[in-house]
Curated annotation (Swiss-Prot):
Organism from which the protein derives: Bacillus pumilus (strain SAFR-032)
EC annotation from Swiss-Prot or TrEMBL: 3.6.5.3
Name listed for the protein in its UniProt record: Elongation factor Tu
Source taxonomy: Bacteria, Bacillati, Bacillota, Bacilli, Bacillales
Any GO molecular function: translation elongation factor activity
Subunit architecture: Monomer.
Catalytic activity: GTP + H2O = GDP + phosphate + H(+)
InterPro entries attached to this UniProt entry: EF-Tu_GTP-bd, EF-Tu_GTPase, EFTu-like_2, EFTU_2, G_TR_CS, P-loop_NTPase, Small_GTP-bd, T_Tr_GTP-bd_dom
Region (G1): 19-26
Chief location of this protein within or outside the cell: cytoplasm
Keyword Transport set for record: no
Length: 396
């Protein structure tokens, strides 16, 4: 069978299902793929077992089970992630293994919000999932309209507690199982849900459209031409003649102009997100720039040394620590291309953090580095990874 060509005319978004265990995340994922496939013949109809038996993957040394499902609506192509276990969600969201432009929060109408409902909303807030659409599931099991309204209010309040616009979030009431079984009324609810996702979750800005940034991996001098910084462009575009800043690991940001862009020894007019390049920098000496800094469009990212983060600590089985750590723990924080020592401050009431836990923490780095909300990092001890995290807010 010939491979289907990827249709680029539709915009693309990454989404996922979140919510408490057994509230119907996987059933909903199966229902969406099945109902949409039935209508358009595109994508693949996935059964519950195919999604639930997701293979384990290794992402930054962490074992995560994730199911990847794709489907399309009339206007968009979606990549959808669903995780079998709660721990998989935590790891997935913190490591960014599955980037989400928006999430469908599944809440059982029969049970209402539960502890993991709250935890997944908090995680979404901390790791920067920008939009949430709610699916109240199992509505076929609740015949009291007032009860449904009560659960909806509870979910909206919970979202507002974590700075999501609880009053404006779309809430769709349905039954994933009934839709999967082919009940037309409940299939209609799946279309209603996907219309809400299409409309409420904006198309993400592509990496190439964002302001330029490239982590510096290596630096060398070319006699008679100047200093070259190499690395993979993380976002945006850069062309000859652009002014860039050199940020991190030093008191002052350096400013310079890109006088040449090379890829595979060929000169380019410009480079964009995903390209591995060498950038020739005007008037910069070999000592002015080092691995671990970033080149960026002036004024778009700033160096910081203190931030709050959401962190997952590797379990012993994943090659992590065998013992807990306490406040004032001083590991290395690996950002993009370099390690920086930092001091950990734990939240009030948290005495210690065990391997396999996830926690919020405050980190104080010994030197500044270019970071912003949503920047990912690893925590390392002597070169081995013991944790993974994401910056949730900047302090200074």
């Amino acid at each position: 069978m010939a491979k289907e060509k990827f249709d680029r005319s539709k915009s693309h978004a990454n989404i996922g299902t979140i919510g408490h265990v057994d509230h119907g995340k996987t059933t909903l994922t199966a229902a969406i793929s099945t109902v949409l496939h039935k209508k358009s013949g595109k994508g693949t109809a996935m059964a519950y077992d195919q999604i639930d038996g997701a293979p384990e993957e290794r992402e930054r040394g962490i074992t995560i089970s994730t199911a990847h499902v794709e489907y399309e609506t009339e206007t968009r192509h979606y990549a959808h992630v669903d995780c079998p276990g709660h721990a998989d969600y935590v790891k997935n969201m913190i490591t960014g293994a599955a980037q989400m432009d928006g999430a469908i929060l599944v809440v059982s109408a029969a049970d209402g919000p539960m502890p993991q409902t709250r935890e997944h909303i908090l995680l979404s807030r901390n790791v920067g999932v920008p939009y949430i659409v709610v699916f109240l599931n199992k509505c076929d099991m609740v015949d009291d309209e007032e009860l449904l309204e009560l659960v909806e209010m509870e979910v909206r309040d919970l979202l507002s507690d974590y700075d999501f616009p609880g009053d404006d979030v779309p809430v769709i009431k349905g039954s994933a199982l009934k839709a999967l079984e082919g009940d037309a009324d409940y299939e209609a609810k799946i279309f209603e849900l996907m219309d809400a996702v299409d409309e409420y979750i904006p198309t993400p800005e592509r990496d190439t459209e964002k302001p330029f940034m490239m982590p510096v991996e290596d630096v060398f001098s070319i006699t008679g031409r100047g200093t070259v910084a190499t690395g993979r462009v993380e976002r945006g575009q850069v062309k000859v003649g652009d002014e860039v800043e050199i940020i991190g690991l030093q008191e002052e940001n350096g400013k310079t102009t890109v006088t040449g862009v090379e890829m595979f020894r060929k000169l380019l007019d410009y480079a964009e997100a995903g390209d591995n390049i060498g950038a020739l920098l005007r008037g910069v000496s070999r000592e002015d720039i080092q691995r671990g800094q970033v080149l960026a469009k002036p004024g778009t990212i700033t160096p910081h040394s203190r931030f709050k983060a959401e962190v997952y600590v590797l379990s012993k089985e994943e090659g992590g620590r065998h013992t807990p750590f306490f406040a004032n723990y001083r590991p290395q924080f690996y950002f993009r291309t370099t390690d920086v020592t930092g001091i950990v401050h734990l939240p009030e009431g948290t005495e210690m953090v065990m391997p396999g836990d996830n926690t919020e923490m405050e980190v104080e780095l010994i030197s500044t580095i270019a970071i912003e909300e949503g920047t990912r990092f690893s925590i390392r001890e002597g070169g081995r990874t013991v944790g993974s995290g994401v910056v949730s807010s900047i302090i200074k």
